[in-house]
Amino acid sequence: WGMHYVALNAPGIMPGNPMGYQWFDLYLNGVYISDVGPKEFEIVRSLINENVKKISNSISLISNDLNIEMSDCFVMGFSQGGIMAFELGQSLNKKLAGIAIISSRIISKEYVPNNSFLETPIFISHGAKDNVLPISNFDQSVEILKHHNYKFESHLLQNDEHTMSQETITLFQNFIKKNI
């Protein structure tokens, strides 16, 4: 394909999982992020925004070194990385080649879509047997994408848990081929 791949790790180690990384703490004051109040959500939002800037700077540096445009970049994120991928796309004033949200969700239910991002193709997938993020997160994310008229394809994978299966990889590869 003549492609370059770069994988960024989140800066924090997941509590209870020394092999896992996190962009932000899932539990603020002992409350899971889906259940936090507005004050705690603002803390999560500021952490997301801070890390989105770091990701954006990293991608800019790498794309400049490789002499490629942002419109030639696909950004994929798994779990919290999917949240970050969507938020990155939303924060840029540029169209990307594509965004992938895998076993993840769109964290904000209310926002004003960025017109450049509305033109970016989005791949979203989730495992029906995911025991980390409920399917309701996938359903809500798909509804947000539909409501704002994003260009997207969605895949609910019946045999998948909270993982990147071979089926997910194949579907994402096909998404890339369609959008390069």
Where are the regions a protein language model picked out?
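Short beta-strand immediately N-terminal to the catalytic nucleophile in serine-hydrolase-like folds
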Residues: 75-77, 102, 125
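Serine-hydrolase catalytic machinery in alpha/beta-hydrolase-like enzymes
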Residues: 1-68
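Short beta-strand/loop motif that positions the catalytic acidic residue
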Residues: 123-126, 130
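Active-site signature of alpha/beta-hydrolase-fold catalytic machinery across serine-
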Residues: 87-91
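Short, proline-enriched alpha-helix->beta-strand connector loops that line the catalytic pocket
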Residues: 70, 117-122, 148-151
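A conserved short beta-strand
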Residues: 94-106
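C-terminal catalytic histidine-bearing segment of alpha/beta-hydrolase fold enzymes
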Residues: 136-180
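Gly/Ala-rich beta-loop-alpha elbow adjacent to hydrolase catalytic centers
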Residues: 76-81, 85
